[in-house]
Every structure is written in C-alpha cells, then in structure tokens.
C-alpha cells in the first residue's frame, strides 16, 4: 500500500502536464523560401520564349486617356546579349537599334555612323529603349524573394531585382510573379536615387509557336500620372538569326 501511494504521488502531478502538452498546436516546419533565381528564369520564358527569336511590337502611346501615337518595331533577339530592332512605322523607316552586351546604338538615316544610347532613354511615350530591346531580367538583375501577396486577383511571389550589370535598364525592380507558374503580373521600376518612375502590368498572354508568351504589356508614368503606353506583341517565333545581323560596323544591315 505504501508503494502504491508513493507511485501515485509521483504520477498524478504529471497528468495535468500531459493534458496541457496534448492541447498545444502541432508544430510545423517553416515553409522553404522560394528560389528567387529559379523563379526569375522561369518568368523570363514568358517574355523570351526561345534562345533565338523574332517578335513584332506595336506601341500605342496615350496622353490624358487619349491615343497619341502608334509605333511598330520588329525585334530580333539572340541569346541574352544581342538584340536588333528594326523601326517599321513609315515616318521612322530606316531607323534601327542594336544592343550588344552592355552597349546600345541607334542608326538614323542620313547620319554616317550609329549613335550610342542608353537602355533608360525614352524610345516612345513611356517606353524606354530597354523595355523593348533588353528583356532578359535573369541576366541583368540579382533577385531576392521579399514576400507573397495577392496582385490582380492572383497569389504572387514578390521579388526585388537589383541591377548587377551596367547595361541594365533600371537600378531596382519590384516584380510580382504568379505563384503556380512564375508568370509576370506586375512590376515597379526605380532609379539609382530610389525614385519610383514607372510601373507595368502584364495584361495578356497567348500561345505562339507552341509557347505561352506575353501578348500585352502596359507601362504607366508614375511621375506625371497622365500618360501610359500599351505594348502589343505578335508573331513571336523561333528563328535562326545570323551573327552578321548584330555586327555594329555593318552599315548595310544597321
């Protein structure tokens, strides 16, 4: 009897502790942080569907809600370092733009040599040269995962991109990618000073040559708030582009 009482004195005080532990919520491991580099590369596939390809880009500029100008370009891109842009609108006929690595030039009819330009310079409306000719973000920016939140009704990963090469168009980008497939949804663009200058919505996608690619992008001026430009992409398809197309000294081609 003495032995039983002794056991009870030891065991009974532990009973409430056992119930308390059982009532605690189950512990779960913290979710793994998404791989920002992998997400950025996946997102680039929606804008650059093939290693070597051609796409037409129509840009319509709006001022105070009214259509102002319209421009047409043919963009030929090979890898992440070479882009050739042919200006197709009648009043710009004969103009061309070339990107090689971190350098860009524009050729204007009547001039003897190409003029060096920067990706950030205005092409038309709210579109910069780099918005058309430099769209491989994984090559130009270092990404960091920031958070997960909803944008345009979809769960999105938010990445912060910081320029890692001098040819990058912007110093910093906040980039919203849809959780299931890393499809771009929204972006905010910042200068080196930290100034927020432009935003973008990735509005429509379509199947082209067997790939889901970007069809419509809208760029908004975040300084004046009175203008925006709509970029519509069509005919995107893989092409075996010759290296001579990207030769800066070839004035017949450039």
Predicted segments with their positions:
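N-terminal secretory signal peptides that target proteins for export/translocation
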Residues: 1-8
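Bacterial N-terminal signal peptides
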Residues: 10-23
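Flexible, processing/modification-adjacent segments and terminal tails
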Residues: 30-52, 58-59, 67-69, 93, ...
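Extended lipid/amphipathic-ligand handling interfaces
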Residues: 43, 73-77, 202-207
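N-terminal, post-signal-peptide region of Sec/Tat-exported proteins
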Residues: 54-84, 88-90
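Ribonuclease/tRNase effector modules and their secretory precursors
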Residues: 56, 75, 87, 91, ...
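Gly/Pro-enriched, hydrophobic low-complexity segments
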Residues: 136, 154-249
């Amino acid at each position: 009897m003495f032995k039983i009482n002794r056991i009870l004195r030891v065991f009974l005080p532990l009973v409430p502790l056992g119930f308390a532990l059982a009532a605690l919520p189950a512990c779960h491991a913290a979710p793994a942080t998404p791989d920002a580099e992998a997400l950025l590369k996946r997102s680039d596939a929606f804008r650059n569907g093939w290693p070597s390809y051609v796409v037409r880009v129509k840009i319509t500029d709006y001022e105070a809600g009214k259509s102002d100008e319209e421009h047409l370009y043919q963009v030929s891109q090979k890898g992440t370092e070479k882009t050739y842009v042919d200006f197709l609108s009648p009043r710009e006929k004969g103009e061309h733009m070339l990107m090689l690595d971190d350098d860009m030039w524009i050729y204007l009819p009547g001039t003897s040599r190409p003029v060096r330009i920067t990706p950030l310079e205005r092409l038309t409306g709210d579109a910069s040269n780099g918005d058309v000719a430099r769209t491989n973000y994984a090559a130009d920016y270092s990404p960091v995962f920031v958070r997960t939140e909803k944008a345009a009704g979809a769960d999105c990963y938010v990445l912060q991109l910081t320029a890692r090469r001098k040819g990058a168009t912007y110093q910093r980008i906040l980039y919203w990618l849809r959780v299931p497939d890393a499809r771009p949804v929204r972006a905010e663009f910042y200068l080196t000073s930290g100034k927020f200058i432009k935003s973008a919505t990735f509005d429509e996608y379509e199947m082209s040559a067997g790939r889901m690619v970007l069809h419509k992008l809208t760029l908004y001026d975040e300084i004046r708030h009175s203008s925006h430009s709509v970029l519509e992409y069509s005919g995107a398809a893989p092409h075996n582009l010759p290296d001579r197309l990207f030769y800066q000294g070839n004035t017949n081609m450039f």
